[in-house]
A protein has these predicted regions:
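PAPS-dependent sulfotransferases, especially Golgi type II membrane carbohydrate sulfotransferases
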Residues: 1-16, 143, 164, 193-248
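Anion-recognition interface
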Residues: 60, 71-78, 100-123, 151-152, ...
Length: 248
């Protein structure tokens, strides 16, 4: 039986990511997608599609995963992971999509979609995962993809307002990319607890094996971080509790 034809009556939660592009969402989603009961569509947010019912949405995701990946093979963040032998193909308990920056942008530009999709279409509880990376690194990475420094700073904190709204009103957890890389077993277990799925030692070991050794500190790779820009970002960071403690 293919993924797309699996029963969806056991699905407990819909999973959505919130945050920014190039913040570690792809790595985080890939680790969860290793789990046999979690099915995540890469580069997808329900806010950018039009679905009339929950069943239509869930079946669409499962069918696209099967069609594009021939099972559970998916390309995440520049690497393709093997469908972990013995750990894939389980009953779907959590289904969702990963496009953290796209979700933040959609909520920023069209906030009424939030209620329309997450309250009116999706009837099962929605679980949110917010992936937080050092803002200086995340902003720097923006500038490597056609953003000017000041524009990158501006859009980053505009999206942060969308993140703040979700975290203050929805069933969510924050995962810091730096902590995930340092202690992948601990952070993956915490996310799975949030999603109500059991984990095994083999699954956690497999997750640990695909995580790189240290976060990329891209802020040191450019020369445009003036004192004024550093101070501006420092001031902005203080406005968001979930960014507390980050420094240049």
């Amino acid at each position: 039986m293919g993924v797309g034809s699996k029963r969806i009556d056991k699905v407990k939660y819909y999973l959505s990511f919130i945050g920014w592009g190039r913040s570690g969402n792809s790595l985080t989603a890939a680790l969860l997608d290793f789990h046999p009961n979690i099915y995540i569509k890469n580069e997808f947010t329900a806010l950018q599609e039009r679905f009339k019912s929950q069943d239509q949405l869930l079946r669409w995701i499962l069918q696209r995963i099967e069609k594009k990946t021939q099972g559970r093979w998916q390309a995440w963040g520049g690497f393709t992971h093997d469908p972990f032998k013995g750990m894939t193909g389980g009953v779907p308990l959590v289904i969702g999509g990963k496009k953290g920056g796209g979700t933040s942008n959609s909520l920023m530009n069209n906030p009424e979609l939030f209620t329309k999709i997450y309250d009116d279409v999706i009837k099962i509880p929605v679980k949110w995962i917010h992936v937080q990376r050092n803002p200086y690194d995340n902003i720097t990475t923006f500038t490597k993809h056609n953003w000017k420094p000041d524009g990158a700073i501006d859009i980053y904190f505009k999206q942060a307002e969308s993140v703040k709204k979700v975290l203050s009103s929805r069933d969510s957890i924050t995962v810091r990319l730096e902590n995930l890389i340092k202690n992948p077993k601990v952070e993956v277990k915490r996310m799975c607890d949030h999603l109500g799925v059991d984990v095994t030692g083999n699954y956690l070991k497999h997750c640990k094996n695909v995580v790189w050794n240290k976060p990329r500190k891209t802020r040191f790779s450019v020369n445009w971080w003036t004192k004024e820009r550093k101070d501006l970002v420092k001031q902005k960071i203080e406005e968001f509790d979930f960014m507390g403690g980050y420094k240049f």
